Amino acid sequence: MSDKKEDCFVIMPISDCEGYNQGHFSRVYEDIIKPSVFNADFNPVRGDEVSKTNLIQLDILNKLLEAPIAICDLSSRNPNVLFELGIRQAFDKPVVLIQEKG
């Protein structure tokens, strides 16, 4: 039996968004999401960390479909985030939805 953890794909903005301080989503990922995912015995993977080919869209699509679980941060209503969430839902894949309070 392998000790390799399964991936948890993290759907969230990977760059700064209007209305948020610079680096906000990087801090959320590094300080909140990653430790929580590790604690749940999964390996966190964000869209900018999946480069297997030269086509990042294909890499993200594969991870969206292959990851046994995903976390989606809806705080910014980012169009790419909502699109990726729609793909997970269209294929009936489990997703944990999170959003900042306020």
Regions found by a protein language model. Name each.
Residues 1-53:
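Conserved N-terminal substructure of TIR/SEFIR domains
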Residues 45-72, 76-84:
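TIR-domain catalytic/interaction hotspot
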